[in-house]
Amino acid sequence: MAVNTLLKNEEIKRLPDYVEPYYREGVDGIIVQDMGVANVFSENFPDLPLHGSTQLSVSSEYGAAFLKNIGMTRFVPSRELSLDEIRSIKSKIDIEIETFVHGAMCYCYSGRCLMSSYAGGRSGNRGRCAQPCRKKYQMGDEYAYMLSLKDMCMLSDVGKLIDAGIDSFKIEGRMKKPEYVAATTYAYRELRDAYLSGCSDLTNLSVRYENMLRDIYNRGGFCSGYYFVGNGRQMLADKRPNHTGVKIGKVTKINKPFVEIKLSSDVHSGDVFEIRGRQGEVEITCGVDAIADKCISVKGKSFQLISVGNQVYRTRNNRLLNDIQKNIIDNDRKINLRAELTAKIGKKMMLKLSSLGEDICENLVIGPECVSAANKPVTEEQMLSKIKKTG
């Protein structure tokens, strides 16, 4: 559970009441930035694991040791650290480390950015960042998205992260769609499991999943953050601050109302294309399935913005999104449960659920007090039917 913003004094007073329902339901940890918040949790919920947020800007073994000494069990180091620096901290301090492996990156130091607060009164340290780093800025004659960074993708280096002692992978997903969340978590779990099982073909596997994630969301490609190279212009997505898509062809002919596109990749009906030229962008929808090297005709619009030779990008891969929905999101894992229902007049109804199999888990749900039936009493078969409706 994330409570990793800076709180005001009057908000801290209400914090125990806010967290208590989640605590009673079994939340397994809380990530914090504010040391006052950490102190409140330690006093009111002493057995609740606390994790230090990347907003704390912990960048050394001394910071890690401090967090361990005040009772934190895990922390997310500054995103500006290299893998060697993270490995060094892990070798010296016995504390779990969680690092970012995928998603949007901040231009500023973790937890230190005041730009959104100054520019629009929305503090990033209060969870309200307006993302001014995704705006265009001018420097001399250059006018570009000078503070907009590419998204991070560490799929090809999952093994190196594990070998460095990193305990948990963190995926940035602010305001992202379910398909993004499902695909990224699935890809990293697959690579992690493959590496730990000794898979000999991780390169092809990582390339396949990276191509999938690039089709879902990327800003001018991906970068590896500060893990290896450090900062540099190669980290910037200065041409476009949002989803770039993937290049699938170019315009070869204009025959109103149609545009002919020579494909460099397979496309599918329902895909959304963007034709990009010097005059601007035009969004169109593909109505056919076609393979690379073929030419297709797509109904166009805003022809004053389109020229022969314009590059065409796919910003929505319809078949991929449908596959993710079907094979990952809707593919719920089923487990066998044992249910014990106790209902006695004058006593509170109790339902005990226990999982069957390798992962043992129990949960006790206490309901209202049982009373005599005013009309027809509930039968055992009816209760069993209701319980089975849960899945």
Predicted regions mapped to residue ranges:
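Surface-exposed amphipathic alpha-helical tracts and adjacent flexible/coil segments at the periphery
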Residues: 1, 9-16, 20-23, 32-36, ...
